[in-house]
UniProtKB/Swiss-Prot annotation:
The modification Phosphoserine is found at residue 183. One of its GO terms (biological process) is receptor recycling. It is found in: Early endosome; Recycling endosome; Golgi apparatus, trans-Golgi network; Cytoplasmic vesicle, Clathrin-coated vesicle. The lineage of its organism: Eukaryota, Metazoa, Chordata, Craniata, Vertebrata. GO terms for molecular function: protein homodimerization activity. The gene is Pheta1. It comes from Rattus norvegicus. This is Sesquipedalian-1.
């Protein structure tokens, strides 16, 4: 893997918060002693410096595919960072105290992306279980026929509603005019001329009443039937 040294140096010393930092004893090669170095953990990258005030790291350890375990060593509070594969040598480190040892082991064990993926997967499963068992996510109407009804768009986005659609109310028809009192259904058939004369008399009678010319007028209901209808002035 090729890494940009300048980018790594900037990332190691930037002002962003670190996941863990402190002094650890790092063992060198075979037969070499341990050196006290300043370690900084950012994400899945472990930097180590010669001192806390150093601006450039001495080395970088990429924490992917590794395991962190306690080891028996001449240093107290020692642990090792091991990688899969026989060619990769373990990094043996030692803390100053038991609390520092536990803090570093916990932080390094949780630094890899593999661990983060497992955590995200577990959280997704818990969230899905909470959503399935939460009554707040149920629809207001338990009727299985209830469907989401699309509403007109607002600002280019469709607004949906889980409430059942209210039935449309048909407009009322205008009231029918009152029927005239007539016995035409039972009486003899009336010609068009007779109907014209009858309704003409009614119209003239109403006009005269409106003008105040007449007080009453007898209008035959059916011409030739002998029956009459009296209209009184209101």
């Amino acid at each position: 893997m090729k890494l940009n040294e300048r980018s790594l140096a900037f990332y190691a010393t930037c002002d962003a918060p670190v996941d863990n930092a402190g002094f650890l004893y790092k063992r060198g090669g075979r037969g070499a002693g341990s050196h006290r170095r300043w370690f900084v953990l950012r994400g899945n990258i472990l930097f180590y410096f010669e001192s806390e005030s150093s601006r450039e790291p001495l080395g970088v350890i990429l924490l992917e595919g590794c395991t962190v375990e306690l080891v028996d060593a001449r240093e107290e509070f020692a642990f090792a960072v091991r990688f899969a594969g026989g060619r990769s040598r373990p990094y043996v480190l030692a803390a100053d105290s038991q609390a520092a040892l536990e803090g570093w082991v916990k932080a390094l064990s949780r630094a890899s992306f593999h661990y983060l993926r497992l955590v995200v997967r577990e959280l997704e499963q818990q969230l899905a279980a909470m959503r399935e068992g939460s009554p707040a996510n149920a629809l207001p109407d338990a009727n299985p026929s209830t469907v989401l009804n699309p509403k007109p768009k607002e600002n280019g986005r469709a607004v949906w509603s889980a409430l059942p659609e209210q039935p449309a109310v048909a407009p009322r028809r205008p009231p029918l005019p009152p029927r005239r009192r007539a016995s035409a259904a039972n009486g003899p058939s009336v010609s068009f001329a007779q109907l014209h004369e009858r309704y003409g008399l009614e119209v003239r009678a109403l006009r005269n009443q409106w003008r105040g010319g007449l007080t009453s007028l007898e209008v035959p209901c059916h011409p030739g039937s002998g029956e009459t209808q009296t209209q009184d002035q209101p």
